[in-house]
Amino acid sequence: MANIPLLLSLADDLGRMSMVPFYEPYYCQRQRNPYLALVGPMEQQLRQLEKQVGASSGSSGAVSKIGKDGFQVCMDVSHFKPSELVVKVQDNSVLVEGNHEEREDDHGFITRHFVRRYALPPGYEADKVASTLSSDGVLTIKVPKPPAIEDKGNERIVQIQQVGPAHLNVKENPKEAVEQDNGNDK
């Protein structure tokens, strides 16, 4: 299964290869390229297989984004009952797990299980993760945008206390008090 993207890429590359000059129309190139007769059917089969694998994963169509309201993930989990889903926070990630035991469907028996992990963006608090499940099977996970941090450095405003009249000169300590502070007793 891990080779499917590689094979699709190879099929695309072979489809673009041509043994005729670039100035001929594309349809002429397709007719003269001997590899295309082999690649066409293989490419169709690989695309069908990719669709089947994506559809059976249980959580296809998951979309995550960071918007003006914060971080949000939406995923289709319509193949699962609410009791078969678990959303949990682990460190700075949100884990979504869906699991249902073997059951019968239109094509036979099926078991589904998936685990998705979403790393929270820097600054987003894992304690504020919330999830909702719509009636049509769309699971939405939201984390509110963190408050903007204003960088003021070490600046702070010092309150001014109002007092009675003051003299502009600084009072000096009496000479004896200064000598006692220095440890010289007379």
UniProtKB/Swiss-Prot annotation:
This protein's species is Drosophila melanogaster
Kindly give the InterPro entries that the UniProt entry links to this protein.
A-crystallin/Hsp20_dom (IPR002068), Alpha-crystallin/sHSP_animal (IPR001436), HSP20-like_chaperone (IPR008978)
Molecular function (GO) terms listed?
unfolded protein binding
According to the entry, every stretch annotated as the sHSP domain falls at 53-161
UniProtKB keywords = Stress response
- Positions of the UniProt region annotated as Disordered: 163-186
In the UniProt record, what gene is named as encoding this protein?
Hsp23
Which GO BP terms sit in this record?
A: chaperone-mediated protein folding; cold acclimation; protein refolding; response to heat; response to hypoxia
Family note: Belongs to the small heat shock protein (HSP20) family.
Write down what this protein is called: Heat shock protein 23
Question: Which Gene Ontology CC terms are recorded?
Answer: cytoplasm; cytosol; nucleus
Q: Which residues form a coiled coil?
A: none
- Fetch the Pfam families from UniProt: HSP20
Q: Where is the composition biased (Basic and acidic residues)?
A: 169-186
Q: Which domain of life is it from?
A: Eukaryota
